[in-house]
C-alpha cells in the first residue's frame, strides 16, 4: 500500500519502499495558477527536512518548494523542464518534482496524513 503524507507548506510525499516521491499538492498548484517554470535540484544533492529543494514559478509568483523529509535526490522529473504545466494537470501524478532516498524515515511520522491535511485545508478556507 502506498502512503501519502503532506506538509503544512503543501508539499506531498508518496513513499515507495525507501524512496519518497515529492511534489506539491493540488491545493498548492491551484493557489499558484499556471506553472511556467520549475527549477529542480541536482541528482545527488542532499536535502534537509524544511530546507529549500526546488523552485516553482507561475504566472502569479515564484515559490520555494521545501524538502518534506531529509534525504538524497536520486531522481528528478526532467519532463517538467519542457512541460511545467504537468504540475497543474496532475500535481500528485505526472507533475512530481523529485525522488528522495530517505535518510531518516522516522520524519514521516511528523507529516500529516491525508485526513489531517484535508482538515488543515478546511482551516484555510
From Swiss-Prot:
Superkingdom of the source? Bacteria
SUPFAM superfamilies the record matches? Single hybrid motif (SSF51230)
- Which residues are recorded as modified (N6-lipoyllysine)? 60
- Ranges for domain Lipoyl-binding come to 19-101
Q: Name one Pfam family in it.
A: GCV_H
Looking up InterPro entries in the UniProt record yields: 2-oxoA_DH_lipoyl-BS, Biotin_lipoyl, GCV_H, GCV_H/Fam206, GCV_H_sub, Single_hybrid_motif
UniProt keyword Cell division present: no
Where is the signal peptide, in residue numbers? none
| Record keywords, A-Z | Lipoyl
In its UniProt record, which GO terms are filed under biological process?
glycine decarboxylation via glycine cleavage system
Any GO CC annotation of this UniProt entry: cytoplasm
Q: Which residues form a coiled coil?
A: none
For whether the record's keyword set contains Flavoprotein, the answer is no
- Give the cofactor note: Binds 1 lipoyl cofactor covalently.
Q: Which cofactor does it need?
A: (R)-lipoate
NCBIfam families listed in its UniProt record: gcvH (TIGR00527), PRK01202.1 (NF002270)
Subunit relationships: The glycine cleavage system is composed of four proteins: P, T, L and H.
Similarity field = Belongs to the GcvH family.
Protein function: The glycine cleavage system catalyzes the degradation of glycine. The H protein shuttles the methylamine group of glycine from the P protein to the T protein.
- The name on file for this protein is Glycine cleavage system H protein
Amino acid at each position: 500500500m502506498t502512503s501519502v503524507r503532506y506538509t503544512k507548506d503543501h508539499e506531498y510525499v508518496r513513499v515507495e519502499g525507501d524512496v519518497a516521491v515529492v511534489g506539491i499538492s493540488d491545493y498548492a498548484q491551484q493557489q499558484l495558477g499556471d506553472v511556467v517554470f520549475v527549477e529542480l535540484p541536482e541528482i545527488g544533492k542532499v536535502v534537509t527536512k524544511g530546507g529549500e529543494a526546488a523552485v516553482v514559478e507561475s504566472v502569479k509568483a515564484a515559490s520555494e518548494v521545501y524538502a518534506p523529509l531529509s534525504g538524497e535526490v536520486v531522481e528528478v522529473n526532467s519532463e517538467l523542464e519542457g512541460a511545467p504545466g504537468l504540475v497543474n494537470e496532475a500535481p500528485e501524478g505526472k507533475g512530481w518534482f523529485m525522488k528522495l532516498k530517505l535518510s531518516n524515515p522516522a520524519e514521516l511520522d511528523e507529516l500529516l496524513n491525508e485526513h489531517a491535511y484535508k482538515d488543515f485545508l478546511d482551516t484555510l478556507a
